[in-house]
Amino acid sequence: MSYLRPSLVMLILLTLITGIAYPLLTTGLSQLLFSGAANGSLLYQGDKVVGSALIGQNFTKPEYFWGRPSATADSAYNAMASAGSNLAATNPALDKAIAERAAQLRQANPAMKGPIPVDLLTASGSGLDPQISLAAAQYQLARVAAARQLAPEQITKLIDESTDQATPNFMGESVVNVLKLNLALDALK
């Protein structure tokens, strides 16, 4: 019985600290210091939320840049089903999926004769990547420029503005946020 009171006091104290004080402190600090990120890095078109800079979206029209293939099975970029494809490099299903994606990309981008950037052929670990490499954006440049009847130089400028530079440079490659780029293209209308 002598242990009951200190145990209850400790339970109440730790519940207040870890269940109320700590969450309120971290939420308050994140809202104060990083409000955009704390609220999901939402992107707007006018007053309407159109997505998050952290989650890819499925673009298939020729006038838009396409992101990485999604590994989510039921529907593309379904965050509830986020997972990698888990196909081994020797799996025939992976070879078939890559061949189908390559054929689709070659058909959609007939002006491009070189190799297709790997991030346009393979799904990411999460299946939800919002970015593509600069090479993947440049691979699609001619198709998007023709579909929108814009000068390639004008779109190249938008690609540069939508590029997140690797910091520091040796920590990876620069990437292009596909949703930001497509929103910038829509803003040109």
From Swiss-Prot:
Transmembrane segments: 8-28
Record's keyword terms, sorted: ATP-binding, Cell inner membrane, Cell membrane, Ion transport, Membrane, Nucleotide-binding, Potassium, Potassium transport, Transmembrane, Transmembrane helix, Transport
Name used for this protein in its record: Potassium-transporting ATPase KdpC subunit
Compartments in which it is found: Cell inner membrane
InterPro entries: KdpC
Record note on quaternary structure: The system is composed of three essential subunits: KdpA, KdpB and KdpC.
GO MF annotation terms: ATP binding; P-type potassium transmembrane transporter activity
Functional note: Part of the high-affinity ATP-driven potassium transport (or Kdp) system, which catalyzes the hydrolysis of ATP coupled with the electrogenic transport of potassium into the cytoplasm. This subunit acts as a catalytic chaperone that increases the ATP-binding affinity of the ATP-hydrolyzing subunit KdpB by the formation of a transient KdpB/KdpC/ATP ternary complex.
Organism: Serratia proteamaculans (strain 568)
Membrane topology: Single-pass membrane protein
Presence of keyword Cell inner membrane: yes
Superkingdom, natural source: Bacteria
Pfam families attached to this UniProt entry: KdpC
GO cellular component term of the entry, any: plasma membrane
Similarity field: Belongs to the KdpC family.
UniProt keyword Nucleotide-binding present: yes
